[in-house]
């Protein structure tokens, strides 16, 4: 039996401490809590304080005063009935007990890193990396199972583990609706959007828009927007979530740990390209599933299964909560996904309609996701990968959301803290500490070895997400921005530029760490979803109309995109200027911020973009047949339109063919003129000219 599961009476016989000594042992931060608990149940509090004193004394004798082995003493009594007191840590304000990793945990971590490096290096040798397609699209030779695993691993980063569990602890299961909407969106990608992308022979999403609408305004705008989202939103969220585990569980300097992770991640991203990313994602998907399912089993066992969770969640209140305040109370609709359309945190019309547009953007037009599907060897394997990812999308409700709710039941004084001052002491965030729910479970209830496995899971989620961002951002920069600067760049130059850009991303990520630390939200997942609702719907509408309406043209798409993004940026700035007040504060924000839910605003942005794009397209010249053929759903089977070519070389005047070489390009002819006394292919003597 573990030490924290011993009966309180045994502890009292062993410790020989009086009630008053136990109270004093609790320390000044707990004096008010001790007094309240003593008034309610002196006997229970007496035994708890004795247990507290013994745990501290035992830990002090082992580690010289460091509480490196503390665990919640009340886990063994969680199933004793509704009248059981909430579980109490040795220090209710200590969110992360300072325990050191044991040999088993370190062994698991070392084996994990060695295995990941071995798989990454193996994939660099196995796959072709000397061509642009081989590096950025894995040679188009991936089978369905690594594609599906990579889709899931790219989507489920450390931000999901921390964010979904935190939102589950704070508000219940409704946040899982994002996962269920994504389940359908990934299928829409494979069956509707992907056939269009394959028919159009595109590598990146800005490239599709360039072919579909022509011009450079839309592709360039979206390429910059995508890089902005990747660098300052995705990386920042994943790094913040991963930093919670790295800094607290490994007790390493944040910059040192982050730099090491980014260096390993960039190593096999730079050397191996997309193939290395997909194979390592497949490995890390297995690790994530095994670790998360294991923690789920421990979590449900601690509260008596799903039935115990439904009973105890509504009584999981912080002991320091004011009785006259509604702050910190669990939501009455915590176990409902579809909630009130006006007063709830996630209204059901917003879930069905407002949530759909950001989801379609992410799964059907985001470079990170689409690039993995384009790497499949054919459309059938791409569909198989999407089906696999769709099945896996059912699991986050049980692997992340519900364990977060369990964490609130087990640790209400920390996860469900309601007083801003107490929350500041617990997690450094006066808005709330729900985001520590998942790390709390890992560090408190798992035994040696499994704790190391779960840390490896979080590292796997962080690295898989970062590799996806690094590779896809490198692809966009190289193929859509660098190609515009140097249209005649060789494949070798494009490969070098892509790898150098990954290094710049690594440097930018490290420099962004202070911003991550200073931008904590009360609910990380909801915070990032609100930003997505302000920036992504206009882009999704442009892609949807471009794929399904042949009349849509460049002017309509550009102005629809500009108006949508402008309104979204205004709302985003208003959210920063007027942040959501704490529960105990009066809400004095403008009505457009306070009363219009971000999911409803997503619907407004979609409607505005749709109307502007349709009106401008009807009022201007329709697109040419070349911009429609094989680039919409209805024209994807059209014959390939051959561009007009110049006259063949054999029809050139003999005098020109005798002077060097001639190459036809469109309506022009490029000549390499070589003096008679020099070798014909000597580049130092060639002169280029163009006949129009």
PLM regions: where:
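Basic polycationic patches enriched in arginine
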Residues: 38-43, 56, 62, 69-71
